Amino acid sequence: MAVETRAIISDGKGGFADAMLELGDPGPGEVLVEIRASGVCHTDLDSLGWGRSLILGHEGAGVARAVGEGVTHVAPDNRVLLNWAIPCGGCIQCRKGLESLCEAKPRVASDRFRCAEGKVWPSFGLGTMAGHALVPKQAVVRIDVDIPFASAAILGCGVMTGFGSVVNAAKVEAGASVVVLGCGGVGLSCVQGARHARAAMIIAVDVNPDRLVLAEAFGATHQLLASRGDAGLLAAAEAVKALIGRGADYAFECTAVPELAAAPLAMVANGGMAVAVSGVEQVVPVDMRLFEFDRTYVNPLYGQCRPFEDLPKLLALYAAGSLKLDEMVTATFPLSASGLRDAFAAMRSGQGAKNVLVP
């Protein structure tokens, strides 16, 4: 039986509005999820201009309401969270363990989403800013711990991206020195990943003093207030070196500012690793001398997430009191177009860490 639900749908030209959406029954390998919370991410803002009408949202948690044939790992009424980098499990990347780089990208066919406004596609195969989402089974991870839906929802992008960039991609070791540039939700997740890895020094860098207060609460050992006029954060890099006595072993760029894409390279010591976490995609000039002396620069996608290993691990860390998620949700807004406008405004202003839409 088809489900009618309300969704926030973009027009592909920068606008979005509430609309009614009809979802078909789950087919083989599909799950119908009632959305209880949807995180708000910078990528959601970017997606408004992608030239097609989208059911917005790619961070979500809720309750499985119906499952299709062949779905065995979740059942109706299970609490679940959604994963946007959906692995097929069979392509060469998935077989190598690089599931976030899946080449097949399982999707529910777009004709299963019917809207009076015309053809729509679920963002990243999910479309979590809606009352319900119809998704491939590989997108669904069961929640087996006691956690608010809002806290679970943010695991599915920002938290996993930051934490995984530290633990999976960089493989930060105990005793290392780490710099995190930008202390929004992703940067705070890098801080938590570094704390989990038992880094000796975790230096948080931001131009917003309020975010440095958050970074300290999340595990940063040092906080450095940068100047907005510090081009390339070169002065901040010198301050980092003064704190450590040398460059850092690792530096993570979480600002989403194109001009700062190369900034982590200026922070690391010879042989150090700079990690691009925020997903800067613009063409930017880079001083190639920053790569000298075995410095490396990596750009991992989604913290190299293996959803059925990593997301349960993060849930277990939360349940053990070792991962702050409730504290990261600094504001909630109604799951509606007006609520999303307010959430985007809060995000642009730099208020708090993570905004979440709730029904």
Regions found by a protein language model. Give the residues of each.
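C-terminal hydrophobic helical "lid"/dimerization subdomain
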Residues: M1-V3, A262-L265, F308-P359
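NAD(P)H dinucleotide-binding glycine-rich loop of Rossmann-like/cofactor-binding domains
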Residues: M20, C88-L181
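Short amphipathic alpha-helix with an adjacent loop that forms part of the alpha/beta core around
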Residues: G229-G245
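Short, well-ordered loop/turn sites that connect or cap secondary structure elements
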Residues: V74-A75, V172, V268
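Glycine-rich phosphate-binding loop and adjacent beta-alpha segment
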Residues: P258-L323, P359
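Mid-domain Rossmann-like dinucleotide-binding core that forms the NAD(H)/NADP(H) cofactor-binding site
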Residues: V80, Q138-A139, D144-G229
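Glycine-rich beta-strand-centered segment in the early N-terminal region that forms part
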Residues: E22-S38, L48-R95, S100, R142-I147
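Residue-level marker of beta-strand positions
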Residues: E59-A61, N78-R79, Q93, H132, ...
